[in-house]
Amino acid sequence: HHVRERGYVESPVRIAAIRGALEDAGYFRVVPARQFGLDTVTRVHDPAFVRYLQRACATVPEGKSLYPYVFPIRNQTRPPQELSVRAGYYCIDTFTPLNRNAFLAARGAVDCALTAATAVASGERLAYALVRPPGHHAERAAYGGFCYFNNVAIAAEALRRHGRVAILDVDYHHGNGQQQIFYDRSDVLTVSLHGHPNFSYPYFSGFEEERGDGEGVGYNVNLPLPERLDGGRYRRALRTALDRVAAFSPTFLV
């Protein structure tokens, strides 16, 4: 993950490769993303956090990137005034950059996710939002893991007005963002199948005992997997996840 030594792993080639495979399969028709207002983002993310990303990205010199380097371990009640220092107040790691394009790209990813959500809410059985940057590590007031806005959570929040929503996250890393955003809610089920946080990013969340809080107890399901497992064991874990989703009986699955 550490981009300074290994190169930037979240790159446009990922979008091109996935789109090429989908077009070859012939299951989807490509439609352009609609534009949605910033209020769709602030329904999920803290407005102060959103304003920070917008301001900070606009001030980074062209061709440069800003990485967080100081973190509020001792005092989280006083956000630093300097924008470059404040990156550490809002970021969960040291390798997710802010630059001139990050905020605009994150807005575009949200628009794409909401376009897919709107299509499904309007009657489409299936929609695939091909987005970058990704989003599942972004919490209500934090970015990281190359994620700035939580596209999945924003789509789920929009769909919630039309029925029950379940989120199934099968990325190798734990979906800490949607867990944190919906942790005390029972109207959105969050299920994550991922490498165990003992050895996998983001390390500090994704444990099996994290089941929700308050009204959300039982509506957050983590299925951490060992470092080594075969296909059979993975399929059994996936079946457990799917059974939990089915028991919730959602109107929409994100």
Task: For the regions a language model picked out, list residue spans one by one.
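HDAC/HDAC-like amidohydrolase catalytic core signature
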Residues: 1-254
